[in-house]
Amino acid sequence: MEKNRNRSSLQSDGQRVRDTGAGPKRAISLKDVIALIVGVVIGTGIFKTPSMIAANTGREDLFFLAWLAGGIISLIGALCYAELATAYPHSGGDYHYLTRAFGRRIGFLFVWSRMTVIQPGSIAMLAFVLADYLSTILPLGRSAHFLAAAIPVAFLTALNLMGVQKGTRAQNLLTGIKVVGLFAVVLAGVIIPPSSSPGAPVPPHPGASFGLAMVFVLLTFGGWNEAAYLSAEMYEVRRNMVRALLWGVGIITAVYLLMNLAYWRGLGLEEMGQSEAVAADLMRRILGEGGARFISLLIIVSALGAINASIFTGARTNYAMGRDFSIFSFLGKWQERSNTPMNALLFMGAISLMWVLLGSFARKGFVAMVEYTAPVFWCFFLLAGLSLFVLRIKEPEVSRPFLVPLYPFIPFFFCMTCVYMLRSSVAYVGGGAFVGLAVLAAGAVLLLLKRSPSQEGPG
């Protein structure tokens, strides 16, 4: 009875949006979604994590194997999300899948965590990286550093408020500049001979392990699942979503392999392992300080693209939550003229700026944001993978235009990867995980204080 009521409510909610015309409209193309996937994934990690991965592998074959494995694992995850997103196109993305599979309470806890910790924390993380690299070009004091992190978040939020086309065009432009810049680095590292010989060998990393290397690889690949939040606004979603995910992950894997080939060619694995800024060191070796400044500008553009994509998709989850829970109903309003979830965008921008302010008091804002967000993110990513199994059993009658090949082995492997990453992230961040867990607990308390979610609208 409960399952039927849930399904009926889900259908009636979607019908209500169509009847009133107040809701997402199909305005996002295949190209837009691919640009968003590439933009959100290729943020700042590729400029930092290769040195950590080199230190933890210690051998060229293992180093490149780790990056190839990251691409394969991401492709496996993309296949799972392709089935979910084409069977259940919805602006809530993971929230919608978790609600249908595990009930509204789990759905609420996910969207609460994503709204308050996961997405704004990631945006703040990127903003701190942007400010760090801007400070290598312009001298910034402490207050100016905070403003350098906060202003891009506020500006991109305002840009997205102007309309969905403004947001997607900005994303396409930033992603295009980013990809051109990355290939310039690849050409510099592979074609132009280094100006000096690679650095001397260094002792192996004391805690080196292939498993820890994979943690950093998968962190660098993270974000391709954001495409699911655009399924309600995408043209021909049942056909284009699969293509967007596969093309997006394929492009990202190719770019990462080529970038790391350039790093290895220009610096050697040993010097990579001891570098604090591997891309800057490579370009400085080839082009001097001008090359290092070029990398700083490229990282700033890359961070801007990832921030814009995160604001764009994060607001869609907030909108879905506002549609389904009366306490957040102010988030569930869609602005017809701009075709945007205006209140949800404003809320996402405000919470992100709050995390920027909070992180500015921490010793290292970027590290603090990783600690606050990583364990909660991997916990719900695991549940999203499990929802594929649950929904195949609970709702076999739902049309699935795309089915994961080699079921159940591929989704099982994806879930086991999430388990490993959850365990590793908890071990890596230590006490910082309690901040994210405290916010999750606050959501649970809020859920208990309000009326039963079975009386609310669905997710």
Locations of regions flagged by a protein language model:
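Helix-loop-helix junctions that connect adjacent transmembrane segments
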Residues: D19-P24, E60, F64, G141-L147, ...
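Helix-loop-helix connectors at the membrane interface of multi-pass transporters/channels
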Residues: E2-K3, R7-S12, V17, Y95-G107, ...
